[in-house]
């Protein structure tokens, strides 16, 4: 049965086509701020139990869509699935975040790295993509909203792989980058091949847009960012499938702290650039001059403010971008686990309401 996408506003915005309103989805929209997510996670037994079982991943992917009229779903998974598939031994210790049992720190460690067989090691992710697409679609083939697939960037994955987990200063991975750039580039080359293969597998399974999360690109100095992060994002994009089943598959790239390099990111071949909250959205639109769509960029902590303040800040973001195509509303980073769900409802409602008013010329 041919499928019909009932709400394609998000995809049209990414392609800079006119829309009746500004679409919104939120980074980490399926997460710990939702009581129903915590209940499902308890049933799954752990975060990895949740992410590695397609039924659970599907359930939590859909949970925010049941609460809020969001314009896209994003696959529930984790950016560290690729290094886990490489055999580095991923674990999430309570209160400590991700840890790898076998960090990559020596020439011998690097020599062991290889691009994983996506089907053999990450089939649970592509199974989840297919299952989510089915769950988003009714018996008459009508799909509610598009599904986003994603991966960490080659550099961001390398940060966790070399550090062995999270870090405050990334001194281990940066030391390798400066002392042994040959090793770092070997890691990044393998990661770029793996990320491209992983995203292409998600696209083939049914992801209708993909996003590259370069969470730690902003930790690099100018110059180092281009060598160790941006160049490898560009390599991933060059290998991506950009059409599937006759439809364009837009790609989004997001470097947290990357406002300095907006023009360079926009020139990588992406359809859209994600922005954090430190960037003025209106000026960003002028800087990219319509070459790409922009996604962002409300400070996530604003969601702790009173409802009217949330609505006012949402209007400010929308007003900054103005009545132009090519904007997807999002937060400047992932939603906090402590965010009141009712405040998210206020945000989504105001983004839809005010952007419709802007389109109609009614302003605020």
Curated annotation (Swiss-Prot):
Catalyzes the decarboxylation of four acetate groups of uroporphyrinogen-III to yield coproporphyrinogen-III. One of its GO terms (cellular component) is cytosol. Coiled coil: none annotated. GO terms for biological process: protoporphyrinogen IX biosynthetic process from glutamate. It comes from Burkholderia pseudomallei (strain 1106a). It is an enzyme of class 4 (lyase). Keywords: Cytoplasm, Decarboxylase, Lyase, Porphyrin biosynthesis. GO terms for molecular function: uroporphyrinogen decarboxylase activity. Belongs to the uroporphyrinogen decarboxylase family. This is Uroporphyrinogen decarboxylase. Pathway: Porphyrin-containing compound metabolism; protoporphyrin-IX biosynthesis; coproporphyrinogen-III from 5-aminolevulinate: step 4/4. PROSITE patterns: UROD_1, UROD_2. HAMAP family: URO_D (MF_00218). It catalyses: uroporphyrinogen III + 4 H(+) = coproporphyrinogen III + 4 CO2. Substrate binds at residues 28-32, 78, 160, 215, 333. The gene is hemE.
């Amino acid at each position: 049965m041919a499928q019909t996408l009932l709400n394609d506003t998000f995809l049209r915005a990414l392609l800079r086509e006119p829309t009746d309103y500004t679409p919104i989805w939120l980074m980490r929209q399926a997460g710990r701020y939702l009581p129903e997510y915590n209940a499902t996670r308890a049933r799954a037994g752990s975060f990895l139990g949740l992410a590695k079982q397609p039924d659970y991943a599907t359930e939590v992917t859909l949970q925010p869509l049941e609460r809020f009229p969001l314009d896209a779903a994003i696959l529930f998974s984790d950016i560290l699935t690729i290094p886990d598939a490489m055999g580095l031994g991923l674990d999430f210790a309570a209160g400590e975040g991700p840890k790898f049992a076998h960090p990559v720190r020596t020439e011998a460690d690097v020599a062991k790295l290889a691009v994983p067989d996506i089907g053999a090691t990450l089939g649970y992710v592509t199974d989840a993509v297919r299952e989510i697409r089915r769950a988003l679609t009714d018996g008459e083939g009508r799909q509610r909203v598009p599904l986003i697939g994603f991966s960490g960037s080659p550099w961001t994955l390398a940060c966790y792989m070399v550090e062995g987990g999270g870090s405050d200063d990334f001194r281990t991975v940066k030391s390798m980058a400066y002392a042994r750039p040959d090793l770092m580039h070997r890691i990044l080359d393998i990661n770029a091949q793996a990320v491209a293969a992983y995203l292409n597998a998600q696209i083939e399974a049914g992801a209708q847009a993909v996003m590259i999360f370069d969470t730690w690109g902003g930790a690099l100095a100018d110059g180092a960012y281009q060598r160790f992060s941006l160049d490898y994002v560009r390599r991933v994009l060059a290998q991506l499938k950009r059409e599937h089943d006759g439809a364009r598959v837009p790609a989004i790239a997001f470097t947290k702290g990357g406002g300095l390099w907006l023009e360079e990111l926009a020139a990588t071949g992406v359809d859209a650039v994600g922005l954090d909250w430190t960037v003025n959205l209106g000026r960003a639109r002028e800087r990219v001059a319509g070459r790409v769509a922009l996604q962002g960029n409300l400070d996530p902590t604003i969601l702790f403010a009173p409802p009217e303040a949330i609505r006012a800040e949402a209007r400010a973001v929308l007003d900054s971008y103005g009545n132009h195509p090519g904007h997807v509303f999002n937060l400047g980073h992932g939603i906090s686990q402590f965010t009141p769900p009712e405040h998210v409802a206020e945000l989504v409602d105001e983004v839809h309401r005010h952007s419709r008013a802007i389109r109609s010329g009614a302003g605020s």
